């Protein structure tokens, strides 16, 4: 029992019964693993922080682009509005509609004039050649009727033949063409 009373001996004996080398080795390995894990986590944290900075930078650039596009869109919308106001689109549309209506009326008038000329031509060609005589009692031939018809056509188009020149009666009787081409037209008559 004396052994139990001596604390130093008791500690030595207790210590000799314990095998702590494996525990120390395990603790060292755990410490090493913890250091590696801490280092790996720090690297991952650094990587994630850098990635977050990049993403925030990209987000900022995209937001700047969106703001620029919004501003550009607003400016273009404003310009379109100004142009519409300057052009007075509804009035232009009314003017265009009015011009289209006038063109249609002119087309109808021209069509009626052509129809009258065609009817006159039919009448002249269908008239009995024996019944038509000039002042000298000479019969009017088919060629003469065609010439008269052509002259009436020129007259209905407000064009006159004067001194071998075609004159536009709508435009202060200005010549329509050179004398050589009007002379050719007169020869065809």
UniProtKB/Swiss-Prot annotation:
Keywords: Cell cycle, Cell division, Centromere, Chromosome, Coiled coil, Kinetochore, Mitosis, Nucleus. Residues 24-124 form a coiled coil. It is found in: Nucleus; Chromosome, Centromere, Kinetochore. GO terms for biological process: cell division; sister chromatid biorientation. The keyword Transcription regulation does not apply. The keyword Lipoprotein does not apply. It comes from the Eukaryota. GO terms for cellular component: Ndc80 complex; nucleus. Acts as a component of the essential kinetochore-associated NDC80 complex, which is required for chromosome segregation and spindle checkpoint activity. Belongs to the SPC24 family. Component of the NDC80 complex, which consists of NDC80, NUF2, SPC24 and SPC25. This is Probable kinetochore protein SPC24. The gene is SPC24.
């Amino acid at each position: 029992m004396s052994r139990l009373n001596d604390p130093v001996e008791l500690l030595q004996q207790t210590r000799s019964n314990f095998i702590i080398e494996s525990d120390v080795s395990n603790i060292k390995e755990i410490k090493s693993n913890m250091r590696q894990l801490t280092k790996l986590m720090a690297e991952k944290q650094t990587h994630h922080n850098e990635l977050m900075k990049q993403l925030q930078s990209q987000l900022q650039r995209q937001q700047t682009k969106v703001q620029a596009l919004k501003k550009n869109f607003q400016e273009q919308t404003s310009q379109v509005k100004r142009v519409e106001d300057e052009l007075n689109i509804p009035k232009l549309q009314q003017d265009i509609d009015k011009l289209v209506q006038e063109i249609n009326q002119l087309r109808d008038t021209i069509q009626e004039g052509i129809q009258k000329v065609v009817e006159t031509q039919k009448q002249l060609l269908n008239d009995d050649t024996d019944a038509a005589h000039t002042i000298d009692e000479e019969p009017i031939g088919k060629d003469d009727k065609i010439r008269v018809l052509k002259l009436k056509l020129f007259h209905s188009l407000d064009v006159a033949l004067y001194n071998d020149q075609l004159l536009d009666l709508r435009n202060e009787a200005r010549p329509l063409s050179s004398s050589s081409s009007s002379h050719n037209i007169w020869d065809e008559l």
